[in-house]
Amino acid sequence: MGTDIHICPSLLRETGGESGYSPKALKQLSDGKNISCELPYRHFDDNVGIDLFNNNSKRISVSGVQIKYSLVADDGILRLTKEGEQGEFILKPVPNNLRNKEFCPANEHLTMQIAAQVYGIPAAPDGLCFFQDVTPAYFVRRFDL
C-alpha cells in the first residue's frame, strides 16, 4: 500500500506502532490469525479483474442493494473465494451509484463500531481493508456460519 496505518482499521484505536489491524481486532476478526488490511487486487473501477469479481458475486446470497463479495483469509491475505469454497467474510467495496460514495465504507464501519462500543449492541466484527490503490472497502466477518 505504501502507507503504514497506525490506527487500527477495525477498532479505530492506535495500534501501538504496529501497522494494520490491532491484536484485539485480529482476535475478533480471524480468531487471532494475522491478516493484512490490503487486498491483493486493484480497485475494479478500471475494469482490471472485473470478471473475477463478477463471477464471485454469483456465489454469495446476501440481501440488500449494494454489491457484495465473498472473502477468505488465506495465509494472511484476504482474497476472493473460489468456487465451492465457504467464505469467512463479506466485502462491500465503494458503490458506483451513490452521492458521496467514497464515504460509504467508513460510514458503515463507524456505524457498526458505535453500535458495539458505545451502545453495547452485539455486532459482527468488521473493519476497513484497502485495494492496492488505497481505495477503501468495508468488510465484515460472517456470523451466519
List the predicted regions and their residue ranges.
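Conserved ATP-binding subdomain of kinase catalytic cores across diverse folds
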Residues: N47-L145
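Regulatory N- and C-terminal appendages and interdomain linkers associated
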Residues: M1-N47
